[in-house]
Amino acid sequence: QSGKDATIVELTNDNDGLGQYNFAYRTSDGIARQEQGALKNAGSENEAIEVQGSYTYKGVDGKDYTVTFVANENGYQPRVQS
């Protein structure tokens, strides 16, 4: 199935409004993403949001690739797996 014809087949989305959230989705063409975030050191001068997650897609070579990541005060830190 081509990307333009893909539909969302699974979706979750939660946000507590206080700095924590998570979401995930999967599409009919095999793309998937999940992410969760949380406020760290709330109320301090070191307050930051830390995000962890992953996404998966099919490359032009037909292989599935998954990128897992952390994003925080140290920047975006991805790791690719195939």
Curated annotation (Swiss-Prot):
- Gene Ontology CC: chitin-based extracellular matrix
GO MF terms, alphabetically ordered:
structural constituent of chitin-based larval cuticle
Is Nucleus there in the keyword field?
no
Q: What positions does the domain Chitin-binding type R&R occupy? A: 18-82
PROSITE patterns, sorted: CHIT_BIND_RR_1, CHIT_BIND_RR_2
Q: Give the source's domain of life in one word.
A: Eukaryota
Q: Name one Pfam family in it.
A: Chitin_bind_4
Q: Which residues carry this modification: Pyrrolidone carboxylic acid?
A: 1
Give the record's keywords alphabetically: Cuticle, Pyrrolidone carboxylic acid
Described by its record, this protein's role is as follows: Component of the soft endocuticle of desert locust.
The name on file for this protein is: Endocuticle structural glycoprotein SgAbd-5
